[in-house]
Swiss-Prot record:
This is Uncharacterized protein YqhG. Residues 1-18 form the signal peptide. Gene3D superfamilies: 3.10.450.50. InterPro entries: DUF3828. It comes from Escherichia coli (strain K12). Keywords: Signal. Pfam families: DUF3828. The gene is yqhG.
Amino acid sequence: MKIILLFLAALASFTVHAQPPSQTVEQTVRHIYQNYKSDATAPYFGETGERAITSARIQQALTLNDNLTLPGNIGWLDYDPVCDCQDFGDLVLESVAITQTDADHADAVVRFRIFKDDKEKTTQTLKMVAENGRWVIDDIVSNHGSVLQAVNSENEKTLAALASLQKEQPEAFVAELFEHIADYSWPWTWVVSDSYRQAVNAFYKTTFKTANNPDEDMQIERQFIYDNPICFGEESLFSRVDEIRVLEKTADSARIHVRFTLTNGNNEEQELVLQRREGKWEIADFIRPNSGSLLKQIEAKTAARLKQ
């Protein structure tokens, strides 16, 4: 009897898990596009959770891309793939053609006009997949190519650039950072430690509060968020490295003194506190001659803003 009950419980669990979507593919697609009206709110393609219109793997790719993007910058998702646009009026969905691949996959070829009075038509294919009892977008293929492939390609390119910076010795790693400082192919937030990156993100969240002193706040935000701390600001202002000197070094930590020149002729210097985690060197802090730890400054300013 116990075995039968266990079997029935397992069967019930499987039935719930395998419950088919409540809407058909076409109903789902039409529901998505009906929100592309001037008096409606279009769904956000990068949305996660219950309101997501995309599959888990697209969400993972977009989340990684967002994490690889510097605070305040826009990542790969700078337009809406559903309408293949950045702006729309009363979108007119002219046709939806469904091809069911299997029980959990289908292609929806859609043709629409972004604006009601627009003569230009857009045709693209929504790759649909059934997840958690509903149909969601697993990819969009248009004359631009595949959305998923484009995001993954950009992520892989950035990760490859970051991997290429790694060297066995900490001083060689620092030299490589400056060698490629103006490549714009890697975010500085991914050559710092988790603690430093979290501190920057925590401070960035405070920038959405009303500023009491806009000019002063803007200067601080530029220093802590928008300036590349490796070279004291905009990468294009970096000219050359004058000295890289090892102050301390162990197998998994180091302090490196760096002196360099900017394009305006100014000389800057600082100490980079390095640590090696999972075989990769990362910057744990920046020690400036006159102001000390940049990490502590960020944490202190964040705490002060949160008390306001």
